[in-house]
Amino acid sequence: MDVSSSTVQLNTSDGKMDAYVAQPKDGGNYPGIVVIQEAFGVNDHIKKVTERLAAEGYVAIAPDIFHREAERLIPYSDMSKAIATLQRVQDPKAMEDVGAAIAHLKSQKNVKSDAIGVIGFCMGGRLTYLTAAHHASDIKAAVPYYGGGIPAGNPSPLSRTGEIKCPMYLFFGAKDQLIPMDQVGQINTELTTKKVPFQMKIYPEAGHGFNCDDRGSYHEASAKDAWEKTKSFFAQHLK
């Protein structure tokens, strides 16, 4: 499916926020998906994910969660700066940003306003989990990839699990040095206890960031399998 892309500006309480939008060129009505960035910004990888979703028949939008920062793009080689920047991200502000992206999708004539999902990676994986709770009335499917720190924060995304209404598919790597397996077990237990419909896949050979082919941690077999599962999951719950 041919895709067109553009950058739009959305209003937040802290001023304008850029958001990258990719959508099918063909007319018609499509489900919408919010794409939440890694701790490196809305870079080429995140734009590529947004475009891949559009090619599958979605209107996808990636809000720039770093729009309050002087530097909104951080190279993969500068992990210390990425960590420092993500630590300044406040959950309520990030949820406002995601809310603006959801509102934009719902305002578009080619978007099915009752079929909106969310996907995110790394920092965005954690925020995807939080979005499923915070924006529960809008989100119909959520896919967090290697979301670190889900039990962290006050309140933590994990503590809001009971608010989640949509099905989830969570992806982790067993060799992820940033997300210990006991944390993954904690998430599994809480989702089960709160009766959230979910699937979880842990790839034994994958580490953190395994989906990103611009990073040294890219693990092709795991990434391809996760993407096929992601496509099927969104098609099942949004189309």
Please place each PLM-identified region on the residue numbering.
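N-terminal cap/leader regions of alpha/beta-hydrolase-fold enzymes
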Residues: 1-239
